[in-house]
Amino acid sequence: MAKNLAHKTIVDDSSRCSCASADYLLIFRKHGENPVPIEHPVGLLDYAGSREIPGELLKYRGYEGSQIKNRYSHWIWRQYASAFWDDVRLNRVLPFKAARDEEDEKHVHPLQLDVIDRCLVLWSNPGENVLTPFMGVGSEVYGAIVAGRRGVGIELKESYYNQAVQNIHEAHEAKPEQGDLFADVDES
């Protein structure tokens, strides 16, 4: 934890304290019509977050009638449409400590899977390709596979790449119908 965020700093000299920096999700859209709509005909089915879904809404999950009445999907959408995602589970991340080297930056931490799950359901269709140009330990590719998408990741650091391969194999085992992701990879 950063020293300026520690309670001890407040006790010793609060002029040195600070507040935590927020994470930001930047969304870029290409102008024009989307030729392949991302549809949810029975609403949003799964919630990625820490809040408990109210029990009375569960009967609406997968509701096939008018989506105006789908209170389950509406509840999930209100969480996702919020300007602040304060319900993201900070500890829901892939293993990463084994990939760290001594000379790594101190800020290295994988993206939370709740954020990835939300992005995948909102901005991609099952079966589509998801690209992550900074793969790290493979969180986005892992999430893509679990969500029924194909993931393409680029990583320069060998220790991160090796951890990503392990993490992605776990996603593959969770989704055996996806086929062998590494059938053509020479691991030597």
Spans of features found by a protein language model:
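S-adenosyl-L-methionine
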Residues: V165-S188
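Core catalytic lobe of class I
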Residues: M1-N162
